Amino acid sequence: MKATELKDKSVEELNAELINLLREQFNLRMQHTTGQLEKTDQLRKVRRNIARVKTILTQKADA
């Protein structure tokens, strides 16, 4: 997910995306804890996507 794609979305869409990413992060953490997660780089990708969404939300709130 690129920041340019996120900038085109509305605040409601970004909030929905954030909720989905947080759920995905929770599921990945549970899989990692139980040893079922093979691709551990997914955790980092999701965490960075969450940061991207939060950054865009903050920018839109300030504007």
UniProtKB/Swiss-Prot annotation:
Q: Which gene encodes it?
A: rpmC
GO term, biological process aspect, one: translation
* PANTHER family to which the protein is assigned, alphabetical: 60S RIBOSOMAL PROTEIN L35/50S RIBOSOMAL PROTEIN L29, LARGE RIBOSOMAL SUBUNIT PROTEIN UL29C
Family to which this protein belongs: Belongs to the universal ribosomal protein uL29 family.
As one GO molecular function, the record gives: structural constituent of ribosome
Which organism is this protein's natural source?
Alteromonas mediterranea (strain DSM 17117 / CIP 110805 / LMG 28347 / Deep ecotype)
Q: Name one GO cellular component term.
A: cytosolic large ribosomal subunit
Which keywords does this chain's UniProt record carry?
Answer: Ribonucleoprotein, Ribosomal protein
Q: Which NCBIfam families does the annotation name?
A: L29
Tell me which InterPro entries the record gives: Ribosomal_protein_uL29, Ribosomal_uL29, Ribosomal_uL29_sf
Q: What is this protein called?
A: Large ribosomal subunit protein uL29
